[in-house]
Design a protein with these regions (language model features):
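Cytosolic covalent-transfer regions centered on His/Cys nucleophiles
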Residues: 1-170
Length: 170
């Protein structure tokens, strides 16, 4: 008789073990922003890239990569939340990774599977692929918590966001 393998995870994966403090630093660098929204997603992405403290060449490069990624598949998770990010982070000439937390006054249609328009975004830009995957995994893990859509809909301040992320990731 064959023994069944225990497939339950006993220890966190390498990505989950990534230090929450590194994500927090990236979120601090990116800041918390309130945008009008209500336009089409390309206009919103142009507005997002305009928030970056980089020259126009880098902003345009990020914009083009965001558009390519979004055309490939929507970055909307559902429940009005999205994580826009370029497909190829290592090609960007960034000084440091950052995550911009954004709340929209008017939602934008990002073609989410649940058909709900997006009102909150966590815009991820990474210097290298490994960190990109780690941050993306951590952000998605937090945003998939059942209480998060309601919490995010209240437009928390940055400290409240950090506390919520810390509770899930630490």
């Amino acid at each position: 008789m064959l023994k069944k393998k225990d497939l339950s995870r006993k220890k966190p994966s390498r990505i989950e073990k990534h230090n929450w403090q590194e994500l927090k630093k990236a979120m601090e660098r990116g800041g918390l922003h309130q945008l009008e929204g209500g336009s089409d997603w390309k206009t919103l992405f142009r507005e997002l890239t305009g928030l970056l403290d980089y020259d126009t060449t880098i902003q345009n490069q990020v914009f083009e990569q965001l558009v390519q990624r979004e055309e490939l598949s929507s970055t909307a998770l559902g429940n009005g939340i999205a994580i826009p990010h370029p497909r190829i982070p290592m090609k960007l000439e960034l000084r440091e990774s950052l995550v911009l937390s954004l709340f929209l006054n008017q939602p934008v249609d990002l073609r989410a599977a649940d058909k709900k328009p997006v009102y909150s975004l966590f815009f991820l830009l990474s210097c290298e692929a490994r960190e990109h995957l780690q941050f993306l995994s951590q952000i998605a893990k937090v945003l998939h918590e059942p209480s998060m859509p309601e919490f995010i809909n209240k437009h928390p301040n940055q400290e409240q966001l950090f506390e919520q992320f810390h509770q899930v990731l630490a």
